[in-house]
Design a protein with these regions (language model features):
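Switch/communication elements of ASCE P-loop NTPase nucleotide-binding domains
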Residues: 1-47, 51-53, 236-367, 374, ...
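Conserved P-loop NTP-binding catalytic core
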Residues: 40-104
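Short alpha-helical segments and helix-capping/turn motifs at coil-helix boundaries
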Residues: 51-58, 131-146, 245, 319
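Short glycine-/polar-rich loops that comprise or flank the Walker A/P-loop
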Residues: 67-71, 148-153, 327-330
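Conserved nucleotide-binding/hydrolysis micro-motifs of P-loop NTPases
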Residues: 77-81, 160-163, 317-320, 381-382
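Electropositive, glycine-dotted interaction segments
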Residues: 85-185
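Extended helical coiled-coil dimerization/tether regions that scaffold
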Residues: 162-280
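Conserved helicase/translocase motor-coupling segment
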Residues: 372-391
Length: 391
């Protein structure tokens, strides 16, 4: 699994939050309790992991004298260490070119070195930020770069989703279809050869180059992911996505939303299955605008993801939780406010009568997960009394 533990300290409404991520994790609770703050803290961690995207709006919202934010993620590299050791032993037979062999071998050695002193093959990275200062990291930039490559990050924020423009899909597909530097150079040479062998096309490209040169401007080369994304668009001869031969504007928000999320999840799943990566996935309120049947469809799409994927989901949907709880690999955390601070509590699942019998969980049972408390009563009189909305 990618991330095994998260600790957040003094981030907005969060004084201290510890979450273990052994399964698919669902955060449930009332509006305004801080579920999104938990996801945003992880997003903030990743957005600054190898870049500078510093904000002064991340500090304790309840205590102006609290001037330090800490976010710590623990990564499990056990699978990568096994793969790296195997690959190092096999490289002598795979590559005749010493440069290529050395480059790959050094990369795998650097992965092993990350956790060489750790028996459990995990590494904890802490981000610390003090008001008015920059961010300090517990590990150097090179190590963080490797971790970001091994554990790519995807944040599906459904509330701010543009369901008619699916630009983020191409970013994910770019990660899936990313090519090596040597493959990129080969493809670029093939394109140049095609252009140069056609006089008309070559003249057009020459004219474009002269336009940039005369303006004293240049084009910044794309990153590996951006290059792969552009390559995918060329292969499909476009980037606008349609459904059943119609543009996305034709369909309802709910229809587009569920298709968008499912497409992203399938692409991320292929990354986990086919590449040496274990993606970190956050999904914020995926049930927005969805018909109940679409919620069931979405829950099923989440639960069939590769076992290496352990998404963190924030939701208000009792139906989504009910559907997901039909599987064993789900952990629930209740999120609530106490003295204006976000508090998380691990919740227990409803027990089965026996290993051979399936307990029928009703909507009332699931709804109790979203309640502040549960009152057990005996008899119709007590039930009628405590069901009175005026009490």
């Amino acid at each position: 699994m990618p991330v095994t533990h998260i600790r957040i300290e003094n981030y907005k409404s969060i004084k201290r939050c510890d979450i273990d991520l052994n399964n698919i994790t669902a955060l449930i609770g009332a509006n305004g309790t801080g579920k999104t703050n938990i996801l945003e803290a992880i997003n903030y961690f990743y957005s600054n992991l190898t870049e500078n995207n510093i904000s002064e709006m991340v500090f304790d919202a309840n205590n102006k004298f609290s001037n330090q934010v800490k976010i710590t993620l623990t990564f499990d590299l056990s699978n990568f260490v096994i793969i790296s050791k195997t690959q190092i032993n096999d490289f002598a037979d795979l590559f005749d070119d010493n440069t290529e062999k050395s480059r790959h071998s050094e990369y795998f050695k650097s992965i092993i070195a990350l956790v060489s002193s750790q028996k459990e093959k995990t590494i904890s990275i802490q981000m610390s930020q003090i008001k008015g200062r920059g961010i300090q990291w517990s590990e150097p930039f090179q190590k963080r770069t490797i971790l970001k490559s091994l554990f790519p990050f995807f944040y599906i924020d459904v509330r701010n989703l543009d369901i008619n423009e699916w630009a983020e899909v191409w970013n994910v597909l770019g990660e899936l279809s990313k090519v090596s530097n040597s493959e990129r150079k080969t493809l670029e040479k093939q394109v140049r050869d095609i252009v140069e062998n056609d006089i008309e096309t070559a003249n057009k490209v020459k004219a474009i180059r002269e336009v940039f040169d005369s303006s004293k401007l240049s084009v910044v080369p794309e990153t590996s992911k951006e290059f792969a994304s552009s390559l995918s668009k060329i292969y499909f001869s476009g980037e606008k996505i349609q459904q059943k031969g119609r543009g996305l504007q034709y369909f309802s928000t709910g229809t587009n939303s569920v298709k968008y999320i499912e497409l992203l999840l399938r692409a991320i799943n292929e990354i986990a299955r086919n590449k040496m990566k274990e993606p970190v996935v956050l999904i914020d309120e995926p049930e927005i605008s969805l018909h109940p049947n679409f919620i069931d469809e979405l829950a099923d799409a989440i639960m069939v993801l590769d076992s290496k994927l352990k998404p963190i989901i924030s939701t208000h949907s009792s139906r989504l939780i009910k559907r997901m709880l039909s599987f064993e690999s789900v952990t629930l955390y209740n999120v609530k406010l106490e003295n204006n601070y976000t508090v998380t509590n691990l919740m227990k699942r409803f027990q089965q009568y026996s290993p051979s019998s399936k307990y029928r969980v009703l909507d009332d049972h699931i709804n109790s997960y979203f309640s502040k408390g549960i009152l057990f009563v005996e008899g119709e009189t007590e039930l009628e009394l405590f069901s009175n909305p005026y009490l």
